[in-house]
Amino acid sequence: ALDGISSHTRSWLIQQNIIGVYCLKYNRALIGFLFIARHNHMPLSADQVSALCKIGFYATHALRNANLYMNAYRASITDDLTALYNRKHAFEIIDELCLSGTPCSLIMLDIDDFKLYNELYGSKEGDHLIQRCAKIILSALDADDMAFRFSADEFLILRHGSDVAASKAFTQSLVEVLTKGSMSDMVWEITITCGISVFPDISVDGRELIHNVEQAVYFGKLDGKGHLIVYRKGLENRSQNPDIRTAYERV
């Protein structure tokens, strides 16, 4: 029945030929509605009401199971501390995007000397730093961007499009906020080493895209930390020939 419903909602339901709403409840918690529509508006028979109650019962448990599955799935792809997507999901999403042939850019942010930060100020303060960084990263994302906590002190940002200049500008702006803006009340002035790699211009698949961005960060650390390195072919050769400058770009 439509008793207890506002006149506006009742009018809309009648226009849709809905003659009743069955509330789906589990352990007294409302989890959904079953709308009952009938074109001739004739009263339901006792058998029809009984059948609808059975449908409602099974629908309640089906919806409950679906919610449990979604909650479990969400937990399996989410980092507990930051609510960002986790490392496992990063590999899944990046592989999937590259397999589809969609051009993309991958940014890695690595907090310099995070282990020392934890040792000096304690794990609680370290967790607070990670949470603050995650919050700022989330606030900076565009609609199609995705952020992941890749390791204890590393974040990944996946962006659609392989425009290196745009990703550099985005990263520089984000790092400015992380190190000098909203993080100014932190006990330690942090620095962040960043890497950028792109698909398909440089990387051929998702695994190589991740490997290349890790290499960019690695060489950024070698350059003294706090740098932004764009991965170029031949970057690894710097370890044999430090004079090679065309293989990478230091910002």
Functional labels for PLM-detected ranges:
Residues 17-25:
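A short, aliphatic-rich beta-strand micro-motif
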Residues 86-105, 115-142, 148-152, 156-160, ...:
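Conserved long alpha-helical elements within nucleotide-processing catalytic cores of c-di-GMP signaling
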Residues 68-85, 93:
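Amphipathic HAMP/coiled-coil signal-transducing linker helices
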Residues 1-18:
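Signal-transducing coupling segments at domain and membrane junctions
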Residues 24-34:
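Short hydrophobic/glycine-rich mini-motifs in sensory/regulatory modules
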Residues 149, 178-193, 221:
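Catalytic core regions of nucleotide second-messenger enzymes
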Residues 53-60:
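Allosteric cytosolic regulatory segments
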Residues 147, 193-202, 208-223, 229-250:
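Cyclic nucleotide signaling catalytic output domains
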